[in-house]
């Protein structure tokens, strides 16, 4: 673990020295170290000294609990300048995103919301639901009465899966 973090730093240092700055582009250092506080702190400290345009947190959302992820985010960001962009890789559950934003994370990317949508699932203020379950087939209540969003208030739980099917079938037929 420690030797790997050290060898990765050599590569990152060379990468930083080789990178040619261009308008609209930035080079991010990726903080690694699994669930090990000492490795993540060491990695973030060394990356901060190298000085990147932003910092990404990698190696999270791979089976650890929400609490373990939050702890890892906390000690990963201890040495990172607050004025630099912070990017959390591969995290897509709302509870994780909200907790990360509270800790200063700025950017996210994840296939989870798209995958959930494709498979008839939705995130609501009451948790995740599967709109393909029989209980929602004739449920004309809004998707989420607790959210003041257009979709949440104007489309029912029964309408969303039907509309998705009607929108995707012509595309599939063309392909």
PLM feature segments, named:
Residues 9-10:
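Active-site loops and adjacent core secondary-structure elements that bind or stabilize anionic groups
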Residues 15:
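PLP-dependent aspartate aminotransferase-fold enzymes
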Residues 144-167:
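C-terminal extensions of enzymes
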Residues 90-92, 160, 168-171:
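Alpha-helical hinge/cap motifs
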Residues 1-6, 166-175:
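Single conserved hydrophobic/aromatic residue that forms the stacking wall/gate
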